[in-house]
Amino acid sequence: MAAEVLLSSLLGLLFLGLLLPARLTGGVGSLNLEELSEMRYGIQILPLPVMGGQSQASDVVVVSSKYKQRYECRLPAGAIHFQREREEETPAYQGPGIPELLSPMRDAPCLLKTKDWWTYEFCYGRHIQQYHMEDSEIKGDVLYLGHYQSSFNWDDETAKASKQHRLKRYHSQTYGNGSKCDLNGKPREAEVRFLCDEGAGISGDYIDRVDEPVSCSYVLTIRTSRLCPHPLLRPPASAAPQAILCHPALQPDEYMAYLQRQAESKQHEEKTTEEVQDTDRQVWSGSKAAGAPPKKEDVSPAKEEKESELWKLQGPEEQAAAREEAQAGEQDLNHEAAADPAPSPPNDFQNNVQVKLIRSPADLIRLIEELKAAEKGKPSVRREQPGDDTTEAPQREAEGTKAKGKDGEPPGLMEEEDGDDEEEEEEEEEDEEEQQLLGEFEKELEGMLLPSNRERLRSEVKAGMERELENIIQETEKELDPEGLRKESEREQAILALTSTLDKLIKRLQENQSPELVQKYKKRRVVPQKPPPSPHPTEEEPEHRVRVRVTKLRPGGPNRDLTVLEMNRENPQLKQIEGLVTEVLEREGLTAEGKIEIKIVRPGAEGKEEDTRWLTDEDTRNLKEIFFNILVQGAEEANKERQRQSELESNYRRVWGSPGGEDTGDLDEFDF
């Protein structure tokens, strides 16, 4: 892969840079093996170019991509001066020793591993055998690769000085005096290395690999969770990768042309912004002019003065100051309002204006629901006749009481009721039109929202509720005493419990909204409820709940075709991965729906499937966190990582200063 080739060349130049300056100055150069084993690097291809040849710093390396684009890459400070703070003394550990931690393996069943023709059997503290099996029976001779002889002594001064076991973080045993070797006539011997593997607590101890570096001399690697409590054998915390920043290096004329394009683009952007602002001002001034209330021709000047004074009362203080004048002219205003009702004041119009900012489809759906709820209450509100003052209603009621006829109805309001009926009919017609428009808009919106968009909206709502729950938890922690939720574990348990409850509530909401989706969801559900205990339990039930398929792509052949290798179902590492996924699903209350694909890109190793480890120790340790991020935290982080990878690919394919202008590489090539 192109990115890996670029990173490998960078590291090669880095190591040469560590050696060459020392030789030129007469010093002694050395290659830090600890740096190679424990330091990680990550390359970042940036879109911002620089003028080539201007930097003469020792931490800048010039490389070229496969598209012949030159880059100036700045190495991190840790690559030049590797300083790691670590305690050379043994950490304070009061638990059992390494032999005591491994002693339960003596009573456990022997471990088996089949590789090609041979099957290897390891019995802790006793022997290692090699034989061929057919139909679960041993065929032919049984060869002993060695009998137990000794175990590594961590307290020995010579062992402390070597630091081999401490750096590699493994415990070893020596097995010797095995069967006679036909090639050299010496007895066979073997070294057994025990490594901590926290995932082995689910799948059990297993033989990871069997190597034969020298004829009839073997190395067995066994992974177990029994050694993980010991600080010397526990894997170190994975540090963040050291970033190697690479900028495209341009020639002086190319760089000046780039600066010219940037200046022109900035000017165009500023001009566009000014035009938009001018347009907004014109629209705003036009809306103000259109919104001005028209003058009435049949209103006297004294009435206009009173109304203008009344409409000028915008703040609460001005309303209180002018309340006496309003009461003084109350009767005149009431008579005039009965003859010619005044329009609603602009102050009320401004107070009734509501601004809705729609940032996502979820906000749009909520706005539609609010409009529906508001439409239901409109007819009853509109039927009430608005008055100019609160005392108007009692006055009209008193007048109506005096003027009641024999039938108990005000005779003077008969004609007004006819007019009200006509207004109500017009309002009902308007409501029906609004409801019809709203229904059509909602249907179009439902047609636009695909099922994937609905799921995304639900995930956004869930993420927002989780953030609110996080805020509630933080406020609770502040209010409680110091002994409340101090422990991080209690806090995590509370968050997980709330998240699980939230997931159940969302499922119930889905069931109430769409019964058809519920039936489809039940059909697609992969994790069934626990069946009643049967007299003959089968071991195939967990495979129906969660199935993990691990494949490997390796270029091979004259045409560099990709060879697809699939991990065997009997591989202990596959069972370990399935156990991790099942554990995350059960703890979070989630269901195994659909398919999740995770790509791990790293330099490939030569050899057959059995000779290479599918996942590194770091991949296995981080796999649980990867599943948690994808299943629990939603697709936000995944989208960010996908966008970052896309930007890296685009920046890598970009070729500056090509004859036809800027160009890009072949989009069909598999780079990352």
Curated annotation (Swiss-Prot):
N-glycosylated. Intramolecular disulfide bonds. Its main location: endoplasmic reticulum. Transmembrane segments: none annotated. GO terms for molecular function: carbohydrate binding; glycosylation-dependent protein binding; protease binding. It comes from the Eukaryota. Belongs to the OS-9 family. Component of the HRD1 complex, which comprises at least SYNV1/HRD1, DERL1/2, FAM8A1, HERPUD1/HERP, OS9, SEL1L and UBE2J1. FAM8A1 is stabilized by interaction with SYNV1, which prevents its proteasomal degradation. OS9 and UBE2J1 recruitment to the complex may be mediated by SEL1L. Through this complex, may interact with ERLEC1 and HSPA5. Interacts (via C-terminus) with CPNE6 (via second C2 domain); this interaction occurs in a calcium-dependent manner in vitro. Interacts with CREB3. This is Protein OS-9. It comes from Mus musculus (Mouse).
